[in-house]
UniProtKB/Swiss-Prot annotation:
Protein name, UniProt field: Large ribosomal subunit protein uL23
Record's GO cellular component terms: ribonucleoprotein complex; ribosome
Task of the protein: One of the early assembly proteins it binds 23S rRNA. One of the proteins that surrounds the polypeptide exit tunnel on the outside of the ribosome. Forms the main docking site for trigger factor binding to the ribosome.
Family: Belongs to the universal ribosomal protein uL23 family.
Assembly and binders: Part of the 50S ribosomal subunit. Contacts protein L29, and trigger factor when it is bound to the ribosome.
GO BP terms: translation
Keywords: Ribonucleoprotein, Ribosomal protein, RNA-binding, rRNA-binding
Gene: rplW
């Protein structure tokens, strides 16, 4: 798989920014079929950094409704990537 097919988008939240500042860990939404090795390789190729560790979580869908219409959000996979000391991803800086 191409790195841009594996990494869907960065997760922008208060918790993810705390992880960046305190732990040097970056959070991404990734393809549900991707494993940790593929995610590691994709992040290293896309951002030119060295990845030390990858943790993944399957985020379950939640029920939602709008008026009488009921539905569910999509199930997605989240990857928390820890980088080597001194490495940073500029995409997250200054937001």
């Amino acid at each position: 798989m191409d790195p841009h097919q594996i990494i869907i988008r960065p997760v922008i939240s208060e918790k993810s920014y705390n992880l960046i500042e305190n732990e040097g860990q970056y959070t991404f939404e990734v393809d549900r079929r991707a494993n940790k090795n593929q995610i590691k390789k994709a992040v290293e190729e896309a951002f030119d950094v060295k990845v030390k560790k990858v943790n993944t979580v399957n985020v379950k869908s939640k029920p939602k409704r709008q008026g009488f219409t009921r539905g569910r959000t999509s199930t997605w996979k989240k990857a928390v990537v820890k980088l080597a000391e001194g490495d940073r991803i500029e995409l997250f800086e200054g937001v």
